[in-house]
Amino acid sequence: EGMIANQTAFSPSNVHYIPCFETPDVPIKELLWTLINQAAAVVTDYFPAFFLPKMTALAAQKSPVQFQQIDGNGIYPIWATDRHYTTAHSFRRHIQKTIAPFLNDFPVDDPLPRLQRSYTPNSTHFSNAMLTHFTHDITTLDVSTLPIDHSVQAISDRKGGYGEARKRLVHFMNTGLNKYDVDRQSADNDPSSGLSPYLHFGHISAHEMVQRIWVLYQWNPSMVATKATGSREKWWNLPAPVEALLDQIITWRDLGFIYCHHNPNYATYESLPEWAKITMEDHLGDSRPYIYTLKEFEQAQTHDPIWNAAQRQLVKEGRMHNYLRMLWAKKVLHWTNTPQEAIAILEELNNKYALDGRDPNSYSGIMWTLGRFDRAWTERTVFGKIRYMTSDSTKRKMKLKNYLNTYGPTSTV
């Protein structure tokens, strides 16, 4: 869907857009190497997670021409700091001191008019199979023929692409932004933007989200507070709901991207803070109240109706309510034999079903469950000093009636 939107966007320009997907006749690796070997220069996104860092590093090493990676991930550039940060507060304080130059350094809205010449692939450089691929109408592609996991169903209530992302952003700004800091705790009235998958796939940028919000509130960079305290509130001098959203888009999102960039082992138990590993190892021998397998988790077959509902939402919709996503992950830690097993299960479920999976932000969420970016709390069985969450406290904190009706036992996985 994103490719279809791109094809439409590029059609009036001099850019020859090739939707890149694997077929039996044209393996992705062969296609990319052929293009690189015919290129004058290669420009690609920099993305610090999943298999992409290794793939792009290898391509850069073997490329016969200049190979550039562009960091357009977040408002605060990954290269602007030579270290990662262990807490959101420490990173927030750092960016409050140093982000000013980047608040006016946004991408050009439409750079395409600068391209003066069009390009048409021909048989001199490409095989007939590739030429057929290049001229393929992506709108007629039969997705069932692609080598992907077809047990994961398509999401019916949302589509990909920039147009859809922009509609969601405008709708959110008109209906959800002004209560973002309050209703985030309501499962029945989720005010979240729903844009995380679109950010992940590059269908919209954090820059556009932030810039549109600034325009809406007639804000400019000169309005920030003069003192960097690391506080989540009152630094932007915007209404509380807007500051809460900016903290998610800039502080938490960029924190995760920078962490993955500086720590290639970001998805492993070994990458966790020492205090977290020590306390969990101290409690490895604790009796778990329940033990579930990956299959039981995947099929929402636990004793907990709230956990099961969250898992059903993930499988059916590719997303999960933000607060329940934290509880969901905490309970996997609670109901497995080791933290390593919990990480493996969380990574599998998140990467398989979440539309925003395989992303630094989602890895931040998984590993926060086990202590990353957090501090030590009161010691408990199994968790040790890892932050503890329960379904009972969630019931008291959140409105769940409609949510449980929507994703209850009759909602099959």
Label every PLM stretch briefly.
Residues 1-113, 312, 334-336, 340-341, ...:
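Trp/Phe/Arg-rich N-terminal binding region typifying the photolyase-homology
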Residues 2, 51, 161-164, 302, ...:
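Soluble or luminal CAZymes and related metallo-dependent hydrolases
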Residues 22-25, 162, 188, 303:
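A conditional alpha-helix N-cap/helix-loop micro-motif detector
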Residues 35-36, 110-111, 173-175, 288-291:
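A short alpha-helix capping/helix-coil boundary motif
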Residues 43-44, 183, 298-299:
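A generic structural signal for short
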Residues 45, 70-72, 94, 172, ...:
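Structured loops at beta-to-helix junctions and adjacent beta-edge loops in soluble globular domains
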Residues 77, 84-270, 402-413:
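Glycine/tryptophan-enriched, flexible segments
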Residues 186, 190-404, 409-410:
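Active-site-proximal binding-pocket segments
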